[in-house]
Amino acid sequence: MNDASSDPGIPGRPGDVVAAAAPREVGALVFRPLEIDTWQEHVIYMHPDCPVCRAEGFSAQARVRVQIGDRSLIATLTLLGAPLLNTGEASLSLSAARTLSARAGDVVHVTHAPALESVRALRAKIYGCHLDSVQLDGIIGDISAGRYADVHIAAFLTACADGRMSLRETVDLTRAMVRSGQRLNWDREVVADKHCVGGLPGNRTTPVVVAIAAAAGLLLPKTSSRAITSPAGTADTMEALTRVTLDSTELRRVVEQVGAALVWGGALSLSPADDVLIRVERALDIDSDAQLVASILSKKIAAGSTHVLIDVPVGPTAKIREDSDLARLDLAMTKVADAFGLKLRILRTDGSQPVGRGVGPALEALDVLAVLQCQPTAPADLRERSLLLAGELLEFCGAIPPGQGRLLAGSLLDSGAAWARFQAICEAQGGLRTPGQAVFRRDVVAARSGIVTSVDNRHVARTAKLAGAPRRQVAGLELHVRAGDEVVAGAPLCTLHAQASGELEYAFSYALAHDPFRIE
């Protein structure tokens, strides 16, 4: 038996020869690592003729309980024959193997998964019924415990989309998601937070706002998500600059040391059900109002925030397209916030076009550094949006009298105080690093001369994602024009950045076919 890895969290390497040793117990199998990546979905692989499959009557896609030692999880069964597996062997997806700390040769016990009572509530929701708090607690509890397959999660997300959740259900969903994880307490009257609902490429204001607010003396333990349907989330961008995977003890140390943090919320078990939902949402490319509200506010509540500023960009190609959509979102967020005693302020901002130049984690990180360092070439729109939001947050939290927030924010940025605080945050989290650069680049040029009348947010975001963002940290695109700019034929409109030539060409072809820039 050959185990190529000394790390118990990385179960062997492809091609390892694992002897088909006889299991030590009846009804058990021997673990053989195959390193199959299912993107965090727990899957077990068994031979269709293995004695356990026959004895238990397992078939493909069955939900089964998998145990190695004292650790267990629920997984989806996939049948896999020779030569990859023998009848006495089983394998696990990478995420399942890591969860169970599986090593080559371990004894694997596989039994039927217990029936899930919450599936009845899920079916009811699919048919349009309203769910009560007990039913939603059951669904979210099973999701956070890993008992739902991705198909069940996708069904739940779809059943809750397109206005199918009432305000009462949204409150109960948020409460269930808060209960699914730990809840932080900072023992302070004011714990500030800022969030953008997304849908606008670039717009990486959060790191700048956090640095300014922390320099003004506000406590800001900022937890952020990774991208759901966008080319980058705040956590993705910050990861290009520093370590963002901190546990709650490390987070508390950083906040006590420098007054703020910028970390990935998924490492803290704050509303862990939301992290599972986000993973499936990413594949579905959907983001419903109820789920959006519950996702945002459950994590703010769990993080111990008391005052939350929500940036809502509104524009024809943004996530929120009309003021009527904003009004509906405002009502839902206010209702949920009131139920938890959370102070909330929603700020409507211009969502007509991207903000900043970079779209993608590393490229957005460069914009953040340029603004914080007050570089002459820093994107003016990102600077102004950041100062607007920072000033609003300072006033909302009582750090400055009304009407003076923008002035104080500008002073803290121009004096270098915000940059110094940002450096301190990054150093406390593990050190500040320089964002990487992509191997391949290609310009998308203007086909004609004229005025850029609009920039399509969705096509810009899609192009950046096809180039590899956020999966490849350095991938994305760099914008060279904004609406209102005059261009000549052949002038670069944006530059694509990619780590693979195939992704570069794919993104380039999409940009040519869908042209994010309208020129008249």
From Swiss-Prot:
It catalyses: thymidine + phosphate = 2-deoxy-alpha-D-ribose 1-phosphate + thymine. It comes from the Bacteria. The keyword Oxidoreductase does not apply. InterPro entries: Glycosyl_Trfase_fam3, Glycosyl_Trfase_fam3_N_dom, Glycosyl_Trfase_fam3_N_dom_sf, Nuc_phospho_transferase, PYNP-like_C_sf, PYNP_C, Pyrmidine_PPase_CS, Thym_Pase_Put. One of its GO terms (molecular function) is 1,4-alpha-oligoglucan phosphorylase activity. Keywords: Glycosyltransferase, Transferase. Its EC number is 2.4.2.4. GO terms for biological process: pyrimidine nucleobase metabolic process; pyrimidine nucleoside metabolic process. It is an enzyme of class 2 (transferase). GO terms for cellular component: cytosol. The keyword Nucleus does not apply. Belongs to the thymidine/pyrimidine-nucleoside phosphorylase family. Type 2 subfamily. NCBIfam families: ARCH_P_rylase, PRK04350.1. PANTHER family: THYMIDINE PHOSPHORYLASE (PTHR10515:SF0). This is Putative thymidine phosphorylase 1. It comes from Cupriavidus necator (strain ATCC 17699 / DSM 428 / KCTC 22496 / NCIMB 10442 / H16 / Stanier 337) (Ralstonia eutropha).
